[in-house]
Amino acid sequence: MGPSVLPAWLQPRYRKNVYLFIYYLIQFCGHSWILANMTVRFFSFGKDSMADTFYAIGLVMRVCQSISLLELLHIYIGIESNQLFPRFLQLTERVIILFGVITSQEEVQEKCVVCVLFILWNLLDMVRYTYSMLSVIGTSYAALTWLSQTLWMPIYPLCVLAEAFTIYQSLPYFESFGTNSTVLPFDLSTCFPYVLKLYLMMLFIGMYFTYSHLYTERKDFLRVFSVKQKNV
């Protein structure tokens, strides 16, 4: 008797693809719901809807961003092929802004820049997760591939600018209320506004590194993709 062959659904590659497909589908549904909700609210209430964007979709946004931390594990154990450090920088940016700045300071949640930031984040994520979800099942569309590799070029810098402006607008509130600051009985007390100011400078350094990495990755990917298209 020859060696037994496992059914397709028991093979590691199949299970990995099923898991990734479900993960991407959940993220796609979450970000689609957020963007659809924001769009409907804007057309229903106009500019007034921007002030309470966080109250309407903040919970789902926090869930989606929390789940996205799994991507670091995916890369570490090898089921995703992205590089760990650039993805770590991108996720860290969002976690700090969403949880450290917006969620922890109620006055910031009402700012219009929060609405703009959420729109930019969700535009990127909807395209990225749609492309990733279809790639797992072996489906490829040239237009979607190009969009997933190109949309970030104008939007990612806008995201960083919106994040920086969010931090800038939050500073007076953190300084006034002392949110997230720790007072100790010696000279090592932690003042959160100073941490944010330091992070504000690091944000643009991280943007340069991430943008350079993504641009190099885009050139390599599209070159290989164009060769495959010619051979089809």
From Swiss-Prot:
Domain of life: Eukaryota
GO molecular function: enzyme binding; very-long-chain (3R)-3-hydroxyacyl-CoA dehydratase activity
Any Pfam family matching the protein: PTPLA
Protein topology in the membrane: Multi-pass membrane protein
Reaction catalysis annotation: a very-long-chain (3R)-3-hydroxyacyl-CoA = a very-long-chain (2E)-enoyl-CoA + H2O; (3R)-hydroxyhexadecanoyl-CoA = (2E)-hexadecenoyl-CoA + H2O
GO cellular component, one term: endoplasmic reticulum
Top enzyme class: lyase
GO biological process, one term: very long-chain fatty acid biosynthetic process
Keywords noted in UniProt: Endoplasmic reticulum, Fatty acid biosynthesis, Fatty acid metabolism, Lipid biosynthesis, Lipid metabolism, Lyase, Membrane, Transmembrane, Transmembrane helix
Location, primary (coarse class): endoplasmic reticulum
Residues in coiled coil: none
Compartments (UniProt record): Endoplasmic reticulum membrane
Cytoplasmic side: 1-19, 78-112, 157, 211-232
EC number(s) from the headed UniProt entry: 4.2.1.134
Cited InterPro entries: Tyr_Pase-like_PTPLA (IPR007482)
Active-site residues (renumbered): Y156, E163
Membrane-spanning intervals of the chain: 20-40, 57-77, 113-133, 136-156, 158-178, 190-210
Pathway assignment: Lipid metabolism; fatty acid biosynthesis
Residue ranges, Lumenal side: 41-56, 134-135, 179-189
Its biological purpose: Catalyzes the third of the four reactions of the long-chain fatty acids elongation cycle. This endoplasmic reticulum-bound enzymatic process, allows the addition of two carbons to the chain of long- and very long-chain fatty acids/VLCFAs per cycle. This enzyme catalyzes the dehydration of the 3-hydroxyacyl-CoA intermediate into trans-2,3-enoyl-CoA, within each cycle of fatty acid elongation. Thereby, it participates in the production of VLCFAs of different chain lengths that are involved in multiple biological processes as precursors of membrane lipids and lipid mediators.
Assembly with partners or alone: May interact with enzymes of the ELO family (including ELOVL1); with those enzymes that mediate condensation, the first of the four steps of the reaction cycle responsible for fatty acids elongation, may be part of a larger fatty acids elongase complex.
Family: Belongs to the very long-chain fatty acids dehydratase HACD family.
Annotated protein name in UniProt: Very-long-chain (3R)-3-hydroxyacyl-CoA dehydratase 4
Organism ancestry: Eukaryota, Metazoa, Chordata, Craniata, Vertebrata
Name of the gene encoding the protein in the UniProt record: Hacd4
